[in-house]
Amino acid sequence: MKAVLAKRVHSGRADLTEFRELAAAAGYEIVGEITQTRAEDTAHHFGQGKVTEIAELVARTDAETAIIDNEVGPYQMFNIGRILPGETEVLDRFTLILTIFGQRAQTRKAQLQVELAELRYQLPRASAKTSLAKRDERPGFMVLGDY
């Protein structure tokens, strides 16, 4: 599978060497890399322009996955996914490492432990995605109820 790597650092130079090796170990073909040096944006993790640049690179290279070498919050992941083209999958470093563990788990117990870790990690992301997707459906001002 083709993947684009992206990394944001607060200051200094972004080094993607280890991250590149992790992506290759998970079976991804790296077709592009983008780095950004700046403070974290609360909405998109990267700046809005950089997310657009990632989307253009994904479209140009026909990548199926964008992998971010940072811990990305559930709302940030959702916002990035909305900007990327089509059904582009967005992964962060933690998910990538879980993917590698899942591919290499030999025993049933190890496979179940990896699956449990994945589900625990995905729960707040699924909740955030549902909340954001249903935000416009809440009728009225200050309506009670949570998704």
Language-model regions, residue ranges each:
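Alpha-helix boundary/interfacial micro-motifs
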Residues: H44, G81, G86-T88, R104, ...
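Short alpha-helix plus adjacent loop in nuclease-associated cores
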Residues: T95-V114
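Short amphipathic alpha-helical patches
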Residues: F46, L57, G81, Q103-Q106, ...
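N-terminal accessory targeting/assembly segments
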Residues: M1-T99
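Flexible nucleotide-interacting loop at or near the entrance of a catalytic core
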Residues: R108-Y147
